[in-house]
Amino acid sequence: MNILILSGSPRRGGNTDLLVESFAQGAAAHHQVDILHVRDCKVGPCKGCNACFKSEGVCAQKDDMSYIYEKMNHADMLVLASPVYFYGLSAQLKTVIDRCHNPVRDTFHIKKLGLILVGAATLPQLFDAITTQYRLVLNFFHLEDAGMVLVRGAKDKGDVKEEQLKEAFLWGLSLV
């Protein structure tokens, strides 16, 4: 299985990156894993012009989204990874997701979706808004829920705990 991780953290070497690396190490035991850090891509927000619907999925914007579409086209599973900012995904990852409002998405072979989230707060509702959207996306695209790792109380670089990294690793290792 080809697994693409879209990592939405703007911070290099932070908690999201640590969890992504742990997951990827586990998953790489049985699968091909590709990590794409959206912070390294130049992607503008969707302009809602619908040019993509008139041109077989070709976006009017000339940026790195075409590269991301290509990566997504080769994936069997997609993992969205993000720090939580104001109960939502990072702006970088949300921008990429919004740009999937494009008919090119219908050519993707993605069958499974997973989620890695890390936030500084510890309240029980921290991930509710994102997991609600996640489940709506699963239903809309008829995707299998491959699982998730949700980490609370990790603000500064390295705050993620060893058992949380192990959880991400074991989730990756367990994928069939």
Question: Each predicted region: which residue ranges?
Answer:
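N-terminal beta1-alpha1-beta2 submodule of the flavodoxin-like/Rossmannoid cofactor-binding fold
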Residues: 1-81, 87-103, 158, 162-176
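Cofactor-binding loop segments of dinucleotide-utilizing enzymes, especially the Rossmann-like FAD-
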Residues: 8, 38, 117-120, 151
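Structural signal for conserved beta-strand scaffold positions within catalytic alpha/beta enzyme cores
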Residues: 35-37, 61, 115, 147-150
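Flexible loop residues that form catalytic
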Residues: 83, 153-154
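Short glycine-rich anion-binding loops that position phosphate/pyrophosphate groups of nucleotides
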Residues: 84-86, 120-121
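A charged, well-structured terminal subsegment
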Residues: 134-151, 159-162, 169-176
